[in-house]
């Protein structure tokens, strides 16, 4: 990963004076393009009174007239919502408003497991049969071409209100109210479902409806849509309303989350409130969450909130459980060497697949699809990716060949498929893997001025908030830091804490999930990237940094060390001039997964520079390869030995060779495409099966006959040790293990001796 500083012209001095901006806030506003009197005035002073006329949104007047007609004539109205925080708040906004207007209004939230996302034909048929005369979708509907058609043909009008991307064909609804409808005149196009619902209710009531802003804000933050433009008004004013809310449901939810009314910010909503609402739909029927938000009874609301708290705790447990099982699958099948992951277990809980896939991407930096089987026998799953790999573009061209259902966007997707298509999908997904744009670049805002840091510094920064999509929380750089008081913390010592000192100032920094850091690595740190927050300890409030990234450089030593042992470090650092590999197959792993610039990667056999600092990232297979790497004139060598070139980590035991051969003789229709499926049945990983088969081919025990693997009827009797491939691999494994396990000082001496020959 590359870090790059944002650049922008400075704010005019008169604007800085008019809005009383400190130097940090002034720089941050300039970087975000909020650099004129009009823009700054909007940022500080705009309220719901400044929102655009709802009538500008596509089909708004038509929708409002139809809703008023239904209310006047006493028609039954059903709000068709969604099971995430956005859909839940949108359903609540619409239901509450129509109830105030005296409508015969009901709501329906589809069940994630039985109904799936969006319009469902069976549920539409039920709603129509139950006497509904008007369906209003919220946070869904644009995919419901057939469902909407069915309702309209049965004299039930459908008003689609949504914000998701239109597909090739739009539903022929009575009205479609959408913030990004082609050609519409509404000036803001990135509302969430709750934002669209709130806009409709403004139009219905001919009022700004500030009492709905707390719900619209939760949907906005939960769905990660823009918090700029009108989104800024929704979130800023919504937080103000939330902090003085009298909704029993929200007050109970806030209490259970351990938050305090009056001091809740956007981070609290994103990490504590929205996830609790999401948890309901992940594990149960999301109607429960709507009941909570609509409740006007304190005791009832607390009872529902307590149930939601149980579900949220269960969601956390299931996420950890499925994640751990996925990591076991990866190692059991040697998939850590792949560029992509497709993980399946029929027992995985469907409600947490997306959360787990996201955690695995964060851990492995690999596009990941996690699959399970539902009660109907359908294999369903969620996928997640990262910047540089468009998941939708990767799967969309092959959806008709492998998938029964598919939808998503750049970095997330949902899909369904037949169970017998999992292995072919895994293979195709891996074969087609390609990262666009090279090394991922992340931007930071500015160098942190270390002198005079106080809690008031954060107040200055927060003038640029509330933060979210489109206005991200600022990231600051601390260059060439002096690090002291370093220690690890947490149950498993996965987190670190230390003090950074520079130019007369210091800052306490916490690094979550940065347990790979240790005292040996601290001299290599050239930049620390942090976001600032407040820490309260024993009633004392202080400023602290939350680490978001690191950059490394070779330390300037008075006496250079020719060889440095970094085998035990769990982090590949971007400080070497050149990263050397013995095996060409490891190049995409280093480039894509380890995020090292391809221009800095070379094969040992092609490298001809001198005087550079180099890192050996994979392990040589033998003494000859190691000698070839060490015959160059380096300034310094870092021994990382992270990857290897071995076909297997260890030679399978003899009984496994017998089991595989027996299986081949008893299954004469076995094809190469079946090897991966057969491996778990035999208690082996895929690489071990391939290794055993290669030995068998060499010894003449098996052959391919018209594309099928069959055993030779009368093979020559000879021991496994007659295989040159087996014996050569065994020797390579021994050499690799020696290099990986040799005591540090002994290894350094050994390599030094080779370089001095």
Regions found by a protein language model. Give the residues of each.
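Hydrophobic helix-and-loop "lid/oligomerization" segment in the mid-to-C-terminal part
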Residues: 8-134, 154-155, 172, 205-424, ...
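Short, ordered loop/turn segments at secondary-structure junctions
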Residues: 82-83, 110-113, 140-141, 163-166, ...
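Short Gly/Thr/Asp-enriched flexible loops that form oxyanion-binding sites at enzyme active sites
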Residues: 90-94, 145-154, 163-164, 354-357, ...
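Acidic, two-metal ion nucleic-acid-processing modules in DNA metabolism proteins
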Residues: 99, 233-323, 385-392, 396-403, ...
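Glycine-rich, anion-gripping cofactor-binding loops and their flanking helix/strand elements
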Residues: 117-126, 130, 134-145, 601-607, ...
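Histidine/acidic-residue-rich, glycine-tolerant segments that coordinate divalent metal ions
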Residues: 138-191
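A short, gly/pro- and small-residue-rich
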Residues: 149-161, 198-204, 623-641
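Short alpha-helices
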Residues: 172-222, 628-629, 638-641, 651-659
